[in-house]
């Protein structure tokens, strides 16, 4: 499992979460292909993930990075942490994320850490339950981040002020 960090011209932070070799058995032997899982973010709340497949590792990574840039979402952050504690699941992977005080850092494992870092979250407590398959953990983390809304956006949808909601 690789964990690469790159900055590009566009201001995006790119992280390689996983490279996996897959073998297809055919009459003449085995055909090896590679799959790559990457996350891309601007460090200010925009984050995306992508998967790419190819016969060569660099091509798979490139395809995954392009897919991640096309699949970006906006996360409503509260400073450098999350708005509130949230849970999400994808397949057998379940994730729990909660805001943390300033100076805590990112307390999260593996694939979850990569997503939170590129999203711009700097203080968070997170835990992964069930399956730790990186693909499912990234999906679950995205579901949790995507479902999170700021009090301002909830107030606007209801046609009320933030004070009326609390």
UniProtKB/Swiss-Prot annotation:
It comes from Pseudomonas entomophila (strain L48). The lineage of its organism: Bacteria, Pseudomonadati, Pseudomonadota, Gammaproteobacteria, Pseudomonadales. The N-terminal domain interacts with the head of the 30S subunit; the C-terminal domain interacts with the body and contacts protein S4. The interaction surface between S4 and S5 is involved in control of translational fidelity. Gene3D superfamilies: 3.30.160.20, 3.30.230.10. Belongs to the universal ribosomal protein uS5 family. The gene is rpsE. InterPro entries: Ribosomal_Su5_D2-typ_SF, Ribosomal_uS5, Ribosomal_uS5_bac-type, Ribosomal_uS5_C, Ribosomal_uS5_N, Ribosomal_uS5_N_CS, Ribsml_uS5_D2-typ_fold_subgr. It comes from the Bacteria. This is Small ribosomal subunit protein uS5. Keywords: Ribonucleoprotein, Ribosomal protein, RNA-binding, rRNA-binding. Residues 12-75 form the S5 DRBM domain. Pfam families: Ribosomal_S5, Ribosomal_S5_C. With S4 and S12 plays an important role in translational accuracy. Located at the back of the 30S subunit body where it stabilizes the conformation of the head with respect to the body. One of its GO terms (biological process) is translation. GO terms for cellular component: small ribosomal subunit. GO terms for molecular function: rRNA binding; structural constituent of ribosome. Part of the 30S ribosomal subunit. Contacts proteins S4 and S8.
């Amino acid at each position: 499992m690789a964990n690469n960090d790159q900055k590009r011209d566009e201001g995006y932070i790119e992280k390689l979460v996983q490279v996996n070799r897959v073998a297809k058995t055919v009459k003449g032997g085995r055909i090896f292909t590679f799959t790559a899982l990457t996350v891309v973010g601007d460090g200010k709340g925009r984050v995306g993930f992508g998967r790419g497949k190819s016969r060569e590792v660099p091509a798979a990574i490139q395809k995954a990075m392009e897919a991640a840039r096309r699949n970006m979402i906006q996360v409503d952050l509260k400073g450098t942490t999350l708005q509130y504690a949230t849970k999400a699941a994808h397949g057998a992977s379940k994730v729990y994320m909660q805001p943390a005080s300033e100076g805590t850092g990112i307390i999260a494992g593996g694939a979850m850490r990569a997503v939170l870092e590129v999203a711009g979250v700097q203080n968070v407590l997170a835990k992964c339950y069930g399956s730790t398959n990186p693909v499912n953990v990234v999906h679950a983390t995205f579901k949790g981040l995507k479902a999170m809304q700021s009090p301002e956006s909830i107030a606007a949808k209801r046609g009320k002020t933030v004070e009326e909601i609390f």
